[in-house]
Amino acid sequence: MVGYEPLVPTTLPSRLVSIAAYRWKLWKHDGVKTRERTVLITGGTGSFGSTTAQKLLRSESLHEIRILSRDEAKQDDMRRRISDPRVRFYVGDVRDFRSVNEAMRGVDYVFHAAALKQVPSCEFFPQQAIATNVHGSDNVIRAAAENGVESVVCLSTDKAVYPINAMGMSKALMEKLAQAFARNNPGSETVVSCVRYGNVMYSRGSVIPLFIEQLSQGKPLTVTDPGMTRFLMSLTESVSLVEYAFENAQPGDMFVRKAPASTVADLAQGVARVMGVEPDMRVIGSRHAEKLYETLLSVEEVSKAEDLGDYFRVPLDARSLDYGLYTDEGSPGLDQGQDYNSHNTNRLSVDQVADLLMTLPEIQKLVSSRAK
């Protein structure tokens, strides 16, 4: 974001403009001291939480990072790995409002990353997906509002667009909760927004570590569907997306980062190429409720989206529930365009996939160790 100036919205009340300016300063490392802030990351022991925490710890405006998660073993691992007294851990579950509320007291900003994310698991246990991704998200938003939190950024997924699986449906409802809060509470001091992204390479649950393990053991690469496409984003880019939303969001906004895509077959070939292996490939068929391609913005969202260079912003539909408007006046016509999906975005070749993989620290370390 070189040369980028945050879009502090002049249409917001002066109180929210001031909040937006403070949000920007949290991420700046220019020696300018502002009031120290406290950040809560739900589900913070995962890949996103660890990377975000390490970045925030470089800020002059940080007072404390709170990590709320269920797994005390992962918390202990993270505590040893980061070893900074400004990181404080809370064992709790977003499903339990009391534990969320306790962690929320005195917090200025929230990054809501806690979720059930595995598509097959959510298909077999949809009630658990609802409990965490829907009711848990509602607890986070409600506790944030009750404690005067200034900004909440909710992490969503491309599977929330045209959802066909329980995971995507539950995430779509999380987005609706965030938008409904913004629409129904226009005077709230809490700005709730969402970000939506696709596959984060080498994050927990990514297929890339599986491919590496299979190649290391001399096994064939198991590919669900060779023509299946997925968006590809690095962990650093996913954190930058949240940072961008944090700096710029108006109530109810949705932000998406533009991203390239690859077929599953080309991704597998790219992993094999960086490892210097000629792979055998075995097609095993798609898993429960998987799509051939994923969508980051629907046709309807594209028609309203603001193009911000590397990002899209979809503003909140802030109309009131006045039925007369729907029956008498209606809404403006929608553009007859297309959605933004992993089939029509920039498609990477095998060579380009390999080059992209080589930007990941985990792959660089792996290649270096194999060269010794």
Predicted features along the sequence, with ranges:
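Conserved Rossmann-fold NAD(P)-dependent oxidoreductase catalytic core, especially the SDR/UDP-sugar
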Residues: 112, 116-172, 176, 180
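Conserved residues in the N-terminal Rossmann fold of short-chain dehydrogenase/reductase
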Residues: 69, 91, 131, 225
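Strand-loop microenvironment adjacent to phosphate/nucleotide-handling motifs in alpha/beta enzyme folds
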Residues: 30-37, 146, 176, 180-372
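N-terminal Rossmann NAD(P)H-binding glycine-rich loop of SDR-like oxidoreductase domains
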Residues: 39-57
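Conserved Rossmann-fold cofactor-binding substructure of NAD(P)-dependent oxidoreductases
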Residues: 88-109
